[in-house]
Design a protein with these regions (language model features):
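Short amphipathic
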Residues: 3-11
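Basic/polar N-terminal segments that are highly enriched at the extreme N-terminus
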Residues: 1-2, 110
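Short coil-to-beta-strand transition motifs
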Residues: 2-4, 87-88
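Rieske [2Fe-2S] iron-sulfur-binding domain
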Residues: 13-107, 111
Length: 112
């Protein structure tokens, strides 16, 4: 596995169209399965801290809506669709031998 990636969960444990909140290296991370592709975001909505891993996933749009007030985020990038300029961090994800790995060391968008 590439450096800085940590095991998150078994891919089979997260069905398509669902999200789950996990803790990696002391951080709450929302992991999503969208049509067999896995993504990870910082779990807290910037509005009121709602758990995005418990939000409503729209697979066709690749978005998640916060379960508290419905703010919508792009699952791939973390961009906030409802309130531009209020993104959440997106993390790089790898799928290796049926396991989802997440790097909390760098951002998916910047690679840093």
């Amino acid at each position: 596995m590439p450096e800085n990636f940590l095991p998150a969960l078994d891919a089979a444990a997260l069905p398509p169209g669902k999200g789950e909140t996990i803790e990696i290296a002391g951080q709450r991370i929302a992991v999503f399965n969208v049509g067999g592709e896995f993504y990870a975001l910082h779990d807290a909505c910037p509005h009121r801290g709602g758990p995005l891993g418990s939000g409503w996933v729209e697979g066709e749009k690749c978005t998640v809506a916060c379960p508290l007030h419905g703010w919508e985020f792009d699952i791939k990038t973390g961009a906030c669709i409802s309130m531009p300029g209020r993104p959440v961090r997106a993390y790089p994800v790898r799928l290796v031998e049926g396991k989802v790995w997440v790097s909390v060391q760098q951002s998916a968008a910047s690679g840093q």
